[in-house]
From Swiss-Prot:
Organism for this UniProt entry: Cereibacter sphaeroides
One Pfam family named in its UniProt record: Fe-S_biosyn
Taxonomic superkingdom: Bacteria
GO biological process: iron-sulfur cluster assembly
Name of this protein: Uncharacterized protein in nifU 5'region
GO molecular-function terms, A-Z: 2 iron, 2 sulfur cluster binding; 4 iron, 4 sulfur cluster binding; iron ion binding
NCBIfam families: iron-sulfur cluster assembly accessory protein
Family of the protein in this entry: Belongs to the HesB/IscA family.
Length: 106
């Protein structure tokens, strides 16, 4: 369902270790926003919601709300450093298009 590259795994594990408290998992979500209509979001969660889809991906516990699940199926998450900046990149084979800034999709 979800692939997480070694670079993204290392960045996520570093964030979890630096959280200062136990976390239930990494929440992946799709939210309204951006110039193409939808954008990705991530957060460390202290608890999981009763309706969360819980996925073990590359040794990480990933929490996905039911509405975001359809958009995230097949996504690959990477962590890159380039001239444009450092951060997570989502490669979604199901996205129909994106925006010029690369921050949102439809």
């Amino acid at each position: 369902m979800i692939q997480i590259t070694p670079a993204a795994q290392a960045a996520i594990k570093g964030a979890i270790e630096g959280a200062g408290q136990p976390v239930a998992g990494l929440r992946l979500m799709v939210q309204s926003g951006g110039c193409a209509g939808l954008k990705y979001g991530m957060s460390l969660e202290l608890t999981e919601a009763p309706d969360d889809l819980v996925v073990e991906a590359e040794g990480l516990r990933v929490l996905i709300d039911p509405q975001s699940g359809t958009y995230l199926n097949g996504v690959t998450i990477d962590f890159v450093t380039s001239l444009e900046g450092t951060g997570f990149v989502f490669d979604n084979p199901n996205a129909k298009g994106g925006c010029g800034c690369g921050k949102s999709f439809c």
